Amino acid sequence: MPKWKYLLIEIKKIEEKYGSSLRNPASDSEIIKMNHIVQQKLGNIIIPEPYIEFLKKVNGLDFNGLVMYGVDEDLLEKEIDEEIHGFIETNELWYENDWQKQYIFLGDSDTACYDTKEKVYVELDKPSGTLIQSFKSFDAMLSNALETII
């Protein structure tokens, strides 16, 4: 099991301690809808499979300054009580700057992305876009981000 899944269990315990909880997982049909709308609105983008695995565990995360984007609210089958930073709407904002289109934005505190040109996961400084570090896998990037906030 990837390290980030163990760290997510720790975050769940912290949330429960304060009477809160993690978000529900995204369903397969919500992810299919998201993929379809991504193709329409963002072009020929393939959402990284490890990120989809994350969404199937928890539909986004907003914890201690780290935000990981989830399936956009208007694509969800059930209404939710809290705001989700939607993957599509957030990437549309990032893509207003042409140079940022080489990235698939997955979350932020600093910005968690997939670099489609270099085929690596990266952490970019927010707002300058300066590369902070790169990771060979989504699992390594997410584990690093979660370790920082726990």
Regions inferred by a protein language model and the residue ranges of each:
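A surface-exposed partner-binding patch
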Residues: 1-112
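A ubiquitous, low-specificity "background" feature that marks scattered single residues
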Residues: 76-78, 121, 143-145
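Segments surrounding the PLD/"HKD" phosphodiesterase catalytic module and close analogs
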Residues: 111-140
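A short, charged
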Residues: 140-150
